[in-house]
Amino acid sequence: MKQKIDLSTWNRKEHFEFFCTFEEPFFGITTPIDMTIAYEKAKAMQIPFFVYYLHKTIAAVNQVENFRYRIEGNDVVLYDEIDASSTIMREDKTFGFSFMKFHSDIHEFATIVQTEIERIQITPGLFTREFPE
């Protein structure tokens, strides 16, 4: 679910109006992170590291309201929950875009991810499905 933000009363209206004129109205950062402990936890849980870090990342995103805002057309919307999308490599060295519905239980999420990986690996093309709105 999502809700449209009333820009006329939103305290970030001025920021939105400024940044929405940019060709890419967002910023990204990268930083090295020591993932040793996360890797060890994933292995102890017998969950692939990819699933572990993706789950923890999306769980963190969903805890921060500002990370759940999206620009849709001329509107800002706030999603109740953000799901995951990742590129999945195939044997022939091509990849496809995936959609992985977030689940708070990491074992349930692991099942969702594995099902999606298997689907992508036998589905040709870059865009392998319709993405929910």
Predicted segments with their positions:
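Short amphipathic alpha-helices and their capping loops
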Residues: M1-T21, D80-M89
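Small-residue-rich loop/turn and linker elements
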Residues: F67-F99, T128
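Helical lid/core segments from catalytic subdomains that handle acyl or acyl-like groups
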Residues: R90-E133
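Alpha-helix initiation and N-capping motif
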Residues: R12, M35, I106-A110
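Structural preference for long, well-ordered alpha-helical segments in enzyme cores
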Residues: L54-A60
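Short alpha-helical functional segments enriched in proximate histidine and acidic residues
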Residues: A60-F67
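Gly/Ser/Thr-rich phosphate-binding loops and adjoining beta-strand/alpha-helix segments
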Residues: I5, C20-F49, R70-I82
